A protein has these predicted regions:
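Short polar/charged helix/loop
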Residues: 1-155
């Protein structure tokens, strides 16, 4: 793992998971909140799912709104914007395999951050929401550890 800090912070990061409906939009929103003034971020999935209301609720608890996020696949993102990223952070095995396939034709780095799937949690609403909070908090910790402190306002 690279040392955290400005010198190792990529200019453009793509977070990817299976459906682009929970983990990758949460990670992208967290990254954007911390580094959006200095780095571009987006998210994609292997397939396109539906935005998960528990993910929206977990992010709202910390003041981040992902309610307008629209899940998108790698292919759709490439068709719309191109895949001009320095780094793809994959959060699920299928996304990791897809990102590694991209390295055959695109110059990008790929990091795999195994991240639990909170959608498989059982229990009442609060118990299920707790699993989304845990994923959110794990992603925030990992982003801070990997990319360093958020830049000062005057950077």
């Amino acid at each position: 793992m690279a040392d955290a800090g400005r010198s190792t912070r990529p200019h453009a990061v793509l977070f990817a998971c299976g459906l682009n409906s929970v983990r990758s939009p949460m990670a992208a929103a967290l990254f954007k909140h911390l580094f959006g003034r200095v780095s571009f971020v987006d998210s994609a999935g292997v397939r396109k799912g539906e935005l998960d209301p528990f993910a929206v609720a977990a992010m709202e608890e910390i003041g981040l709104d992902i309610g307008k996020h629209r899940p998108i696949t790698f292919e759709e993102l490439e068709d719309l914007e191109g895949l001009n990223f320095d780094l793809v952070v994959t959060l699920a095995p299928e996304a990791h395999h897809r990102a590694l396939d991209l390295t055959r034709r695109l110059p990008l780095d790929v990091e795999y951050w195994p991240t639990p799937d909170p959608t498989i949690a059982e229990g009442n609403r609060e118990q299920r929401l707790d699993s989304y909070r845990e994923v959110r908090d794990q992603l925030l910790t990992r982003i801070r550890r990997r990319f360093g402190a958020a830049p000062a306002v005057n950077e």
